[in-house]
Design a protein with these regions (language model features):
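Phosphate- and other anionic-substrate recognition elements at nucleic-acid/protein interfaces
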Residues: 1-129
């Protein structure tokens, strides 16, 4: 059984909650909340800002494809990204007694879930078949 001392604490994990119109994020080590419109230019600016944090992982909750643009852009600029199932994040949050559901809370829970579950980034595309 994993104990609290087994949870890695090195590097920042960023949780991203995505909707059609907006991305809401949370950087766990910095305890920083942020948001931006779900548009190419805004996502690129956010990606550059996040790159300065040198995150070990940026995690998106699957949201019917609304996360696709951000995942693509973040991967392109070299940020380690992953996508997780919403049901698992909700079960994790419920296990912690967090029943409220807002974009800000979701982003925080995504980051915490990714750290505890040791989610790994999507492998970079090599360009080879």
């Amino acid at each position: 059984m994993m104990g609290i001392t087994d949870i890695e604490t090195d590097g920042t994990v960023v949780g991203m909650d995505v909707s059609k119109l907006e991305l809401v994020g949370f950087a766990d080590r910095e305890q920083e909340q942020f948001s931006c419109p779900n548009s190419s230019g805004a996502i690129r600016r956010l990606g550059k800002r996040l790159a300065k944090l040198e995150p070990k992982l940026v995690v998106f909750e699957a949201s019917g494809g609304y996360e696709g643009l951000a995942v693509s852009i973040f991967t392109e600029i070299g940020l380690p990204t992953a996508v997780v199932y919403p049901k698992r994040v909700r079960q994790f949050a419920a296990g912690l007694g967090v029943m409220a559901k807002t974009d800000a809370i979701d982003a925080r829970m995504i980051a915490y879930y990714a750290r505890v579950a040791k989610i790994q980034p999507i492998p970079p595309h090599s360009g080879e078949l």
